[in-house]
Structure formats: structure tokens, C-alpha cells
Curated annotation (Swiss-Prot):
Gene3D superfamilies: 3.30.230.10, 3.30.70.240, Elongation Factor G (Translational Gtpase), domain 3, P-loop containing nucleotide triphosphate hydrolases, Translation factors. GO terms for biological process: mitochondrial translation; mitochondrial translational elongation. The gene is MEF1. Present with 6348 molecules/cell in log phase SD medium. GTP binds at residues 77-84, 148-152, 202-205. This is Elongation factor G, mitochondrial. InterPro entries: EFG_II, EFG_III, EFG_III/V, EFG_IV, EFG_V, EFG_V-like, EFTu-like_2, G_TR_CS. Mitochondrial GTPase that catalyzes the GTP-dependent ribosomal translocation step during translation elongation. During this step, the ribosome changes from the pre-translocational (PRE) to the post-translocational (POST) state as the newly formed A-site-bound peptidyl-tRNA and P-site-bound deacylated tRNA move to the P and E sites, respectively. Catalyzes the coordinated movement of the two tRNA molecules, the mRNA and conformational changes in the ribosome. Pathway: Protein biosynthesis; polypeptide chain elongation. Belongs to the TRAFAC class translation factor GTPase superfamily. Classic translation factor GTPase family. EF-G/EF-2 subfamily. Residues 68-349 form the tr-type G domain. The precursor is processed in two steps involving mitochondrial intermediate peptidase (MIP) and mitochondrial processing peptidase (MPP). One of its GO terms (cellular component) is cytosol. It comes from Saccharomyces cerevisiae (strain ATCC 204508 / S288c). Residues 1-42 form a transit peptide.
Length: 761
């Protein structure tokens, strides 16, 4: 056996459970977040494991036993890969529901996890539904907290929230389409939150299904070593079961809904393929696991248990993903995935969770999942229920009891836990207490998404979730006079969803809502109509432009106002310059020598800078990547005050901005279009018409995927054009990439339009 096979590259995994992208970072021109930086930035999983092992020493046998039974699992995938159908089968086989219902509500019931009418009609998952269920494996009972997440790009925040509090995930991939654009996005999110995953290749009963092509794509596109632990028995419509490669046994689903598992000998015609794929599994594991590598070099045949242990180690180390296969709709191959969740994904004691000690200069603290420790929990999702605000909480340390008082670390407010529930989609079951590692929900707690709660004895804060900036806005006006329901709905949606923003434009007297895409905003307008009986008229979708500068400009501005009695006086001198590092956002600095401007006036200058950046001088959009330095100035003994310096700063900024070769920046989107091969020419023509830059083309045997970069301003109405060009068979996804300067003629048009609007006022 060739020793060269073992020349693998050492793993460089991002350590820690908390994302290595700092949450205060500006993402491709997004505005800064007032979130904590990442509490953990370790370079290797090995270092992380040392800390996890140290923490395990502090756990009692009861804690270890309780954690061993727990799995916090998310289900993520590209839209229409069959996540919700898969979850429906999981709930049925774990006896949480008594009958299977299909997505899109075809049987007038709809999938259990799609609890909103809108979800059942559109056949897409909008919110992450949380539920828990039990699974028996080899005589032991395991408790799963299960979260079904949306696959549509516009609902990315729901996926982010789910992954932030989970310990592992099932990545569902379509056997026909393979790795798609949103699969790549979900993979990036899993890496950001260091979530290990088991992969399930779904829709094996569909024509054109090819699981091994999908596995190749996992390796090449997602850059994660992946190998099959099963192969299918039969293909497409003749799919009848799977072969377990590790145990060399065939698994069949019998009964009306596949609830009975039968094991038998492997069909003779599949034995050569089974041995080939089993060997490939061992070789792939040898590349990522040291113990398996030694056995491989010594040419020893690993036992079944040794293979399972190697898969578990490398999956938890996030250096490998085992691949299972089946069809949720055909009730085939789901129970082995539940066994794989138990066998290969971590329990809460095997994951490092870190907080910041606010009382000790934000020092990092490793949380211990023991019930005797002080309580620490994260509110990761809010919902408005019929009994008031429902807050989803992940307990990281200690226990949460009904009737206990808990403290919001951010606000310092103490609140009583009046009711504690476990969620089953939109239904709930009351419980008296939950221990560390569990996910629960509570009522009557006023907080924001991402707030940390403790029992008051410690002041720990969890790092918050990364929130992408909104890229599409539209004006919205209620038809009815029911203003109270309109504002109630907007307030609720904002609290529930950090990517949904609302502002009132005093000039146009319109309410502007902003979000992640057209569908995102459409869903909220529709929810307003259904849940609050508020019909709205919406304007045309608007692009969220940004304004910036390209060269430095000095300023020396004096603000004077005399109106009898005390007047106003403030003078500021300095420089306005572009920020080269887009991760820093807008920067305000002072370098005043000798106290020529007192600190309280400088603070007012800072406020003026923040305010003027919200509405740029060119077209009234937010300013991006600009640094303002005030290094001199003057005050008047009587007339100077905070307002004078705030006004002087704002006027100086506007004046210097217009002299610094300003540019208007527009959002550039990553576009992925998938369509049958016969429409390839039409789709390329359509993208060329939009002046898109085509980056990559992938041709499958019956469909192709085009990846391109395109200005968002040209993409409105693209769904309709694509439907027309592909006879309704094409699909696409959009994701924000970066901001780039608009073409000079577009900039001229935008400025001219803005000036006309201003002149009318």
C-alpha cells in the first residue's frame, strides 16, 4: 500500500465554539455591530479539545450522563432539498407525531414544522421551528433538540440563529442537484459557528440521482473531506434500501410508512461496490485521523468500532463529514441518520462554549455544562405568541427553573421566569426546569435577540450572532386608518428579526422597511395583512446605496449664529479621508493638543459625525468607509456649546465630503441560476442584458448552474424574466457580495433625481 497516500496536510481548524469572524467586524462594507468580539480565536481543534477535556473534569457523573443523552441538532440545506420533509419523517419515527403530512399543505394539514399558513401555501420554511424528540438506540434513550431552518437566502438570519446555539447539524443535499448555492452559504455559516455536520443525500428516488457526484462536490466545492458510510440498494424509482458499509449489512424500510427496519445480507451484485466504497471511507479517514492513519500505514484492517470511533473523532473535529443517503419522501434511510446523530455528533459536554466576564474587563470564561454552576443562557430567538412574547433560550451552564429570577446582563434588569416550556413547532409543553445544554422557551421576558441571561451571581455575556446588513428597501403605507396595528406589527417583526429594519422618512412622510431581499419583505407585508388585518400599499423596491470618498480633503469650518443673547460658536479643523480597510467602517478621531476644544464638545462632534453619516450629502444614503480627524479648533467663552460643535462638525463634513471626489456605491450580488440545459443560451443572454459578470458555469447531464456577479439595481423583476426565459423551470438565488462604485452616468442620474426631489420640497 502506498505510503505517499499519507502525506496529508495537518488540520488547521478554527478553534472554539464561538465564531472566528468577530461580530464587531464590518463585513464587505456593512456597518459596524455593537456586538462583542469573538471570545475565542484558537488556531486548532487540538487546542480546543484540551480545554474541553479540562472542563469535563469538573463535571459530576450525573452531568456526564445527562449530557451524553442530549443532542442539539439543526437541519440545514439549499431551498427545496427536502429538509422539512426529512424533519417530518424524523418526528414520525421518534413518535412525536402520529401521522405524516406533506409540505405545501396538499393534504390540508401541511408539514408539522411549517406552522405558519404562509409557509404551508408557499411550501417553504420561513421561521426556524424548534422541537424536541426522543430516540432509542441499543436500549438507551437519547433526547434531541431539533431545529428545522429555512433554505431560502432571504431568511439567512434564521439559519444563523439556529447554528449559533446548536452543537451539530444534518446537512441535507439533493441527490440530483448536488451542492447548490445556498448549500455553500450554509456551509460557510456552519464554519463560522464551528458546527460539525453529518450529511444526508436526499431524493435518491428521483430520476438522475447521483449520490457519488454529490460527494465529489462536497469534497471539491465545500472543501471538506467527505465519504459515504452507505450505498443505495437500487436506484431512482427502484430504490429499496441502503447498505451499511461499516457493518456490511443491508437495511430495508418496511411497513406503511417505513417505520419497520429490517436488516439482511448485502445483495451479491453490490458486494464489490460495497468493498470499494468501504476502502475509500477508511482511506479518507486515514487522511484526517491520526489513529486511523497509523493502522492504515501498518496495513491493519480496522474493526467496526475503530471505524466508528474515527468517524466520531474527525466529525467532531470538523475535519470530516460522514455521508448517508436515502429518500425522505419515499420513507427510506431516515432511521440510520438518527443513529448517526447519536454516534457521530457531539453532546453539549464535547463542545467548547466561551463567554466574556463583563465584571472582569471582559476576560474570557469557558462555560461548564454542569447544573450546579451559576446559570448562563442566551436568548437566541423571539416570537410573538398568543400569550405574549415567547423567548427561546439555550442554557449553557447551570439550570433554569420556573419561578426563578434571572438577570439580563445587557440591561441589568431582573425578571421572573413565570412559565417554562419545551417547544414542539407552534405547540408547547410546560416543564419545571431545564438543565445545561438544553433549549427551551419562556414567556413574559422583555429582551432583544442575542441577550445573555444569568442568575445574577455572575456577569457573563455570550458573543452575539453575526447579523448581515439589509440590501433592499421599500416604502409601505397602510390602507386603513388602523395605525396602532400597523406600528404594533412593525415593532414585533423588528424584535423577532434583526435583518428587518424600519425607519420613518420625515421628508417623504413614508415608512421605509428594509430587508434581505424582495421575498423577505413580501412575506412581512403578507404577514401584516393576515395577522394584523392591515392592508398595505408598497412602493417599488429600492436599492440601499452607500456614499463614500476617494481622496482626502481638509476642512476648517466655523459655525456662528447670533440671535440676541447667547449665540452659537464652534470652529473645527481637520481632515476627511477614505478608510482603506473596509473592515473598520466609519471612524471618528480627535487629536486636540492643549485642550483647545473641551472633551464634552468633542463628544458632541462625535455625535454629529454619526448623525451626518446616516444621511450622506450626495443622495441621502448612508456613508461608508470614511474617517474624520479633528486636530484643531476654537471655542468662544460665552457662545460655545455642544449644539454649536455638533452643527460645525456636520457642516464641515458635508463641505469636505463634496470636495473629496465622492462616489455612490451600489450592492453587488452573487447570483446563482440553475436551469435545464436547453435554456442555457437564454439564461446567458438574460444575464448579459443585466451586465452581469459570469464567474463560473457547471454543466450537469440535464441541468446547468451559472454563477455571476450583478448589481442589485438591475435584478428587480429578475424572477419574472427568468420564468419567461426558462418556461418556469429556472431557479435562482441572490446573496450580497460587496459594495462597488456605480457607473458615472448612473451616479449623475441618482444625484440629479435626488436634487429634483429636494427642490420640490
Amino acid at each position: 500500500m502506498s505510503v505517499q497516500k499519507m502525506m496529508w496536510v495537518p488540520r488547521k481548524m478554527v478553534g472554539g465554539r464561538i465564531p472566528f469572524f468577530t461580530c464587531s467586524k464590518v463585513f464587505s462594507g456593512f456597518s459596524r455591530r455593537s456586538f462583542h468580539e469573538s471570545p475565542l480565536a484558537r488556531s486548532t481543534y487540538e487546542e480546543e479539545k484540551v480545554l474541553v477535556d479540562e472542563i469535563k473534569q469538573k463535571l459530576t457523573p450525573d452531568d456526564i450522563g445527562r449530557c451524553n443523552k442530549l443532542r442539539n441538532i439543526g437541519i440545514s440545506a439549499h431551498i427545496d432539498s427536502g429538509k422539512t420533509t426529512f424533519t417530518e419523517r424524523v418526528l414520525y419515527y421518534t413518535k412525536r407525531i402520529k401521522a405524516i403530512h406533506e409540505v405545501r399543505g396538499r393534504d390540508n394539514v401541511g408539514a408539522k414544522m411549517d406552522s405558519m399558513d404562509l409557509e404551508r401555501e408557499k411550501g417553504i420554511t420561513i421561521q426556524s421551528a424548534a422541537t424536541y424528540c426522543s430516540w432509542d438506540k441499543e436500549g438507551k434513550n437519547y433526547h434531541f433538540n431539533l431545529i428545522d431552518t429555512p433554505g431560502h437566502i432571504d431568511f439567512t438570519i434564521e439559519v444563523e440563529r439556529a447554528l449559533r446555539v446548536l452543537d451539530g447539524a444534518v446537512l441535507v443535499v439533493c441527490a440530483v442537484s448536488g451542492v447548490q448555492s445556498q448549500t455553500v452559504t450554509v456551509d460557510r455559516q456552519m464554519r463560522r459557528y464551528n458546527v460539525p455536520r453529518v450529511t444526508f443525500i436526499n431524493k435518491m428516488d428521483r430520476m438522475g440521482s447521483d449520490p457519488f457526484r454529490a460527494i465529489e462536490q462536497l469534497n471539491s466545492k465545500l472543501k471538506i473531506p467527505a465519504a459515504a458510510v452507505q450505498i443505495p440498494i437500487g436506484s431512482e424509482s427502484s430504490l429499496s434500501g441502503v447498505v451499511d458499509l461499516i457493518n456490511r449489512v443491508a437495511i430495508y424500510n418496511k411497513g406503511d410508512n417505513g417505520e419497520i427496519i429490517e436488516k439482511g445480507p448485502v445483495p451479491e451484485n453490490l458486494k464489490p461496490l460495497m468493498e470499494e466504497k468501504r476502502q475509500l471511507l477508511i482511506e479518507t479517514l486515514a487522511d484526517v485521523d491520526d489513529e486511523m492513519a497509523e493502522m492504515f500505514l501498518e496495513e491493519k484492517e480496522p474493526t467496526t468500532q475503530q471505524i466508528k470511533d474515527a468517524i466520531r473523532r474527525s466529525t467532531i473535529a470538523r475535519s470530516f463529514t460522514p455521508v448517508l443517503m436515502g429518500s425522505a419522501l419515499a420513507n427510506t434511510g431516515i432511521q440510520p441518520v438518527l443513529d448517526a446523530i447519536v454516534d457521530y455528533l457531539p453532546n453539549p459536554s464535547e463542545v467548547l462554549n466561551t463567554a466574556l466576564d463583563v465584571s472582569n474587563n471582559e476576560a474570557k470564561v469557558n462555560l461548564v455544562p454542569a447544573v450546579q454552576q451559576p446559570f448562563v443562557g442566551l436568548a437566541f430567538k423571539l416570537e410573538e405568541g398568543k400569550y405574549g412574547q415567547l423567548t427561546y433560550v439555550r442554557v449553557y451552564q447551570g439550570r433554569l427553573r420556573k419561578g426563578n429570577y434571572i438577570t439580563n446582563v445587557k440591561t441589568g434588569k431582573k425578571v421572573k421566569v413565570a412559565r417554562l416550556v419545551r417547544m414542539h413547532s407552534s405547540e408547547m409543553e410546560d416543564v419545571d426546569e431545564v438543565g445545561s445544554g438544553e433549549i427551551c422557551a419562556t414567556f413574559g421576558i422583555d429582551c432583544a435577540s442575542g441577550d445573555t441571561f444569568t442568575d445574577g451571581s455572575v456577569q457573563y455575556s455570550m458573543s452575539s450572532m453575526y447579523v448581515p446588513d439589509a440590501v433592499v428597501s421599500l416604502s409601505i403605507t397602510p390602507n386603513s386608518k388602523d395605525a396602532s396595528n400597523f406600528s404594533k406589527a412593525l415593532n414585533r417583526f423588528q424584535k423577532e428579526d434583526p435583518t428587518f429594519r424600519v425607519k420613518f422618512d420625515p421628508e417623504s412622510k413614508e415608512t421605509i422597511i428594509s430587508g434581505m431581499g424582495e421575498l423577505h419583505l413580501e412575506i412581512y407585508v403578507e404577514r401584516m395583512r393576515r395577522e394584523y388585518n392591515v392592508d398595505c400599499v408598497t412602493g417599488k423596491p429600492q436599492v440601499s446605496y452607500r456614499e463614500s470618498i476617494t481622496i482626502p480633503a481638509d476642512f476648517d469650518y466655523t459655525h456662528k449664529k447670533q440671535s440676541g443673547g447667547a449665540g452659537q460658536y464652534g470652529r473645527v479643523i481637520g481632515t476627511l479621508s477614505p478608510v482603506d480597510d473596509i473592515t473598520k467602517g466609519n471612524i471618528f478621531e480627535t487629536a486636540i493638543v492643549g485642550g483647545r476644544i473641551p472633551d464634552k464638545y468633542l463628544a458632541a462632534c462625535g455625535k454629529g459625525f454619526e448623525e451626518v453619516c446616516e444621511k450622506g450629502p450626495l443622495i441621502g444614503h448612508r456613508v461608508l468607509d470614511v474617517k474624520m480627524l479633528i486636530n484643531d479648533g476654537a471655542i468662544h467663552a460665552v457662545d460655545s456649546n455642544e449644539l454649536s460643535f455638533k452643527t460645525a462638525t456636520m457642516s464641515a463634513f458635508r463641505d469636505a465630503f463634496l470636495r473629496a471626489q465622492p462616489v455612490i456605491m451600489e450592492p453587488i450580488m452573487n447570483v446563482s441560476v440553475t436551469s435545464p440545459n436547453e435554456f442555457q443560451g437564454n439564461v446567458i443572454g438574460l444575464l448579459n442584458k443585466l451586465q452581469a459578470v459570469i464567474q463560473d458555469t457547471e454543466n450537469g447531464h440535464d441541468e446547468f448552474t451559472l454563477k455571476a456577479e450583478c448589481a442589485l439595481s438591475t435584478m428587480f423583476g429578475f424572477a419574472t424574466s427568468l420564468r419567461a426565459s426558462t418556461q418556469g423551470k429556472g431557479e435562482f438565488s441572490l446573496e450580497f457580495s460587496h459594495y462597488a462604485p456605480t457607473a458615472p452616468h448612473v451616479q449623475k442620474e441618482l444625484i440629479s433625481e435626488f436634487q429634483k426631489k429636494q427642490a420640490k420640497k
